[in-house]
């Protein structure tokens, strides 16, 4: 990998200042073909006086990366195909090209010594296009993989705005920080055209693949050539933080959230539209709802360095079906979370230990496949666990960053598939941990040198077939990384160089899966170095 980062900041006079960030990264993909390229331009302009601050920023990204779904789990044997993990069975033109644009405008105005007004607007757009040879079956006896040749593009735009007032005042001996506001969002997502039914039997030899970069025929026969999801939300909220003493703090809040949503799909054209499919925008999801949500928290400091905390919050998330019909009333997903913990912090060190419990109901799941696919409310899920984080200086030269997470997340109810009840959810390891050390070698005439390294642990986890009657275990892995960094000045400008070594032992590991009938397994086998220069 090679990359260049530039960051310029300066004043323009009369309260104005500017900043410009440029970042370019490029590397070869770790498997047998593919490139990863990312370029970012981010200018911003700010202005302020003694009462008002204004910030206008823009960010543009150009993205090119492989569209690699990994490999397919052979569900009959609970194994992966017996080929090198670096060998791809799709095509060199399996790439995603994308552009993102983000605009942010923020104003902060001081109304008085204790009150201020904040307002903001943001716009985000994400456009992408990809070609794909989707692997639908791997036959180890005939040594072939079957693919469907597909093509897709999409465009998503998000408008959001916020307005709030913040005040600090006292009620008797109790200091308060009060916030009240409103926010609104409009999310417009359009996918299509999607071509996925022209070439469905593109076979390739898994031992000696011949890549031809086929392009999808402009056909679609399953009524999902165009998919859309239009979501509007409005939230009104109040929150107060009360400082009863120097040691005891409580916060409480209310939020009312409302949404209106329309989503669905339709055919490519009349010639591709079959009976029962939509030729125009007739939604599978057309709903609106609202809910009052509660939040409560408390902090108690035993000493200036040791504190305990507790938090309770509720969530409300609209669901939608784009590509599949809806089974009955698609109720919004609702959740409740509770966290308690302890924290230690001083000028150079902090550590946090927390216990959490998250419960969700009205959990939706797509079941079936093809024309029989349907979105259903299947029941309840619960996540419980422990988190530990530690960061800080062991000595003046040696620092540490460590964390550990234990997560037990399972289905409590599943009306369609009772075998899913009490099973650890797919793709969620119970144990994850990391430990990294960094050492400042010291200042020299030519600059400063830092070195460091550590390990990441990803625990084993399971994937399931469509009715949860079979479980496939993915193994745990320990991955080692290291770096060396050099900081200096060139012509009075700070410059840093860093060499990163990732996965030093060349370990194959599996970060995720997708699907539940013929599981696609994303895996990593990357031993790489990265050279970065920051200005």
Residue ranges and their predicted role:
Residues 42, 46-48, 156, 175-187, ...:
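Structural signature of Gram-negative outer-membrane beta-barrels, strongest in the C-terminal barrel
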Residues 525, 530-535:
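Single conserved hydrophobic/aromatic residue that forms the stacking wall/gate
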Residues 106-132, 301, 308-309, 331-396, ...:
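Membrane-embedded beta-barrel scaffold of Gram-negative outer-membrane proteins
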Residues 2-68, 93-110:
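Transmembrane beta-barrel wall of Gram-negative outer-membrane proteins
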Residues 15-18, 51-56, 114-117, 173, ...:
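Repeated loop/turn-to-beta-strand initiation elements of outer-membrane beta-barrel proteins
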Residues 154, 178, 338, 425-527:
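Conserved C-terminal beta-signal and adjacent last beta-strands/turns
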Residues 103-126, 148-266, 301:
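Face-selective signature of the C-terminal outer-membrane beta-barrel domain
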Residues 357, 377-465:
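Gram-negative outer-membrane beta-barrel transporters
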């Amino acid at each position: 990998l090679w990359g260049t980062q530039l960051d310029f900041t300066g004043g323009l006079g009369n309260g104005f200042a500017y900043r410009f960030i440029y970042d370019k990264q490029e590397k070869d993909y770790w498997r047998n073909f593919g490139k990863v390229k990312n370029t970012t331009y981010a200018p911003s302009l700010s202005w302020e006086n003694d009462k008002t601050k204004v910030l206008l920023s823009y960010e543009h990204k150009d993205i090119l990366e492989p569209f690699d779904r990994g490999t397919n789990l052979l569900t009959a044997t609970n194994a992966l195909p017996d080929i090198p993990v670096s060998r791809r069975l799709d095509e060199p033109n399996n790439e995603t090209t994308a552009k993102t644009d983000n605009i942010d405008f923020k104003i902060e105005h001081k109304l008085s010594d204790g009150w201020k007004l904040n307002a903001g607007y943001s716009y985000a757009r994400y456009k992408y296009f990809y070609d794909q040879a989707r692997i639908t079956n791997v036959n180890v006896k005939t040594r072939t993989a079957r693919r469907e040749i597909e093509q897709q593009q999409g465009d998503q735009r998000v408008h959001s705005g916020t307005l709030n007032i913040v005040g600090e005042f006292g009620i008797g001996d109790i200091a308060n920080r009060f916030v009240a506001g409103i926010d609104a969002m409009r999310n417009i997502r359009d996918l299509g055209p999607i071509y996925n039914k022209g070439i469905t039997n593109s076979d390739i030899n898994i031992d000696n693949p011949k890549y031809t970069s086929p392009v999808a025929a402009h056909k679609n026969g399953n009524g999902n050539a165009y998919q859309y999801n239009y979501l509007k939300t409005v939230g009104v909220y109040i929150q107060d933080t009360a400082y009863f003493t120097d040691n005891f703090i409580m916060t409480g809040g209310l939020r009312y959230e409302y949404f209106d949503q329309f989503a669905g799909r339709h055919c490519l054209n009349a010639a591709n539209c079959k009976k029962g499919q939509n030729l125009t925008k007739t939604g599978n999801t057309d709903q609106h709802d609202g809910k009052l949500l509660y939040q409560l928290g408390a902090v108690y400091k035993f000493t200036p360095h040791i504190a305990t905390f507790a938090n309770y919050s509720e969530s409300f998330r609209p669901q939608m079906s784009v590509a599949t019909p809806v089974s009955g009333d698609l109720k919004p997903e609702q959740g409740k979370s509770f966290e308690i913990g302890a924290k230690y912090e001083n000028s150079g060190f902090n550590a946090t230990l927390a216990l959490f419990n998250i419960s969700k109901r009205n959990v939706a799941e797509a079941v079936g496949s093809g024309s029989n696919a349907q979105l259903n409310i299947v029941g309840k899920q619960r996540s419980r666990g422990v988190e530990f984080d530690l960061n800080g200086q062991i000595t003046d030269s040696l620092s540490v960053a460590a964390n550990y997470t234990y997560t037990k997340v399972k289905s409590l109810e599943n009306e369609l598939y009772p075998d899913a009840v009490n099973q650890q959810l797919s793709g969620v390891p119970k144990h994850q941990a990391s430990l990294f050390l960094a050492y400042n070698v010291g200042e020299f005439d030519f600059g400063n040198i830092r070195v460091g390294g550590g390990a990441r642990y990803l625990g084993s986890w399971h994937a399931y077939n469509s009715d949860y009657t079979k479980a496939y275990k993915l193994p745990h892995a320990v991955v080692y990384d290291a770096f060396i960094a050099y900081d200096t000045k060139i012509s009075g400008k700070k410059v840093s160089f860093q060499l990163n070594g990732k996965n030093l032992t060349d370990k194959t590991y599996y970060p995720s899966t997708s699907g539940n009938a013929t599981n696609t397994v994303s895996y990593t086998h990357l031993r790489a170095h990265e050279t970065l220069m920051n200005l």
